[in-house]
Amino acid sequence: MNKIYYILFLSAQCLVHMGKCERNQKTTRLTRSANNASLEKGPIIERSIRMSNPWKAFMEKYDLERAHNSGIRIDLGEDAEVGNSKYRIPAGKCPVFGKGIVIENSNVSFLTPVATGAQRLKEGGFAFPNADDHISPITIANLKERYKENADLMKLNDIALCKTHAASFVIAEDQNTSYRHPAVYDEKNKTCYMLYLSAQENMGPRYCSPDSQNKDAMFCFKPDKNENFDNLVYLSKNVSNDWENKCPRKNLGNAKFGLWVDGNCEEIPYVNEVEARSLRECNRIVFEASASDQPRQYEEELTDYEKIQEGFRQNNRDMIKSAFLPVGAFNSDNFKSKGRGYNWANFDSVNNKCYIFNTKPTCLINDKNFFATTALSHPQEVDNEFPCSIYKDEIEREIKKQSRNMNLYSVDKERIVLPRIFISTDKESIKCPCEPEHISNSTCNFYVCNCVEKRAEIKENNEVIIKEEFKEDYENPDGKHKKKMLLIIIGVTGAVCVVAVASLFYFRKKAQDDKYDKMDQAEAYGKTANTRKDEMLDPEASFWGEDKRASHTTPVLMEKPYY
């Protein structure tokens, strides 16, 4: 059996060494650095071709299609049924800072309760009507008092608590409905408002009347980010409790959004340029152009204002629905943006330009003259701290990671593998073949290496693609090696198993043969071998002789019984 173990041990060693060879033979994953090719005595410095992005984690909250996943300017991204009626309700996962609803030609705030009873239609707003149980508006202090026995709710921040409060109420006529009311939180007054109406826009002479004198006509309204709404935060039922980690709030100072292109953050080439006098104005512009779920097809006529007014007075949702969510919204034009739109902008504070675009940014460019903003962001709040060490830290992490891999898998351990990062505050760390260029308008004292050939480029629609001549390195680069290695391992493993099984049978049979051979041999019981052999073969020998002897029929020792 020791031979079997020896064979298995040698086979395992063979597989281990084959794995090491396979890793060391991946020459396509590394490129020799030009300025270090002549270093024979020192460590070999090579450049990885893996295009990792050091901004990946930082930029996750700015991927608004994933983080918010619904309209921003108009958020009607979810359907809900109440009884036999279908409604569209807000569904965004992030707060929208500075968003409010403007009622045209009216001094009534949208945070005013809707008109009920004898009130005329335009005397009311969008907020929840007064009720016996005072649930809206309600201050954060009163909310905390209301839910003081609920430990989980007491852990929430003010915005999450307001959202949770509004979403906790279910319509009495349908307890199983997923319909929930949106909310608005006033950060200045620390007050939470539940909204009775989910609609955010109703415009055009066919659907509303801007005439302020016609108090019974349906009012026109639209979303906006004006100065009056700076302290407001628009909330859907789906806003994450940990939105601070998943959603943007502050604008980014000394920065502009860019695209990560093989080792450096580059300008977004295809943008829409708009005049803007301030960051606030640029933020308002990008909000107006942002993702919208507003339906574009309505029914032919909407003239029964008396019916609409009666709907408010009687709290009849079917009548209200016909005004705010017309029939066409649920037919061919039930549009859901899923967060896709012109959601990002770079504001040039020197030239007063606002550059808006609909491509998800993947990095930040350090520029003291710019601000990066989103349609979700606060109109004024700014974070001026640029993460200057992000490149240097990532280079150090990647080198340590590659060093560990070299120690595990490389025969030649005298190698340093550099990541494809060609910008840093430490110009020595990027190992540039030429003199790195100093970025003059950077607040972080960055150096960039521009003489290394890029393996990727920006094409139309701001799409980053790998250049044609390098595609072979990135089209499942490990797939062929892994497939080949897998076949080799399967073959070797199969051969080892066959050899092991054959060896097992061979040694087991040999062991049995040896055992029976020993049984056939004479054993020393005080007599010579020849004497015992003669006794065993002599049929006249006494079976119960006085001396002990082996049986000639069985391999056991028999003795004379005593009675």
Curated annotation (Swiss-Prot):
Topology versus the membrane? Single-pass type I membrane protein
Extracellular face residues: 14-487
Which InterPro entries does this entry report, sorted A to Z? Apmem_Ag1, Apmem_Ag1_dom_sf
Topological domain spans for side Cytoplasmic = 509-563
Q: Keyword Phosphoprotein on this protein? A: no
Question: Where would you find the membrane-spanning parts of this chain?
Answer: 488-508
**Which Cys residues form disulphide pairs?**
none
Family recorded in the similarity comment: Belongs to the apicomplexan parasites AMA1 family.
Q: What else is known?
A: PK66 expressed in mature schizonts is rapidly processed as the schizont ruptures, yielding a 42/44 kDa doublet associated with the surface merozoite.
Protein known as: Merozoite receptor PK66
Q: Which organism is it from?
A: Plasmodium knowlesi (strain nuri)
Q: What is the lineage of its organism?
A: Eukaryota, Sar, Alveolata, Apicomplexa, Aconoidasida
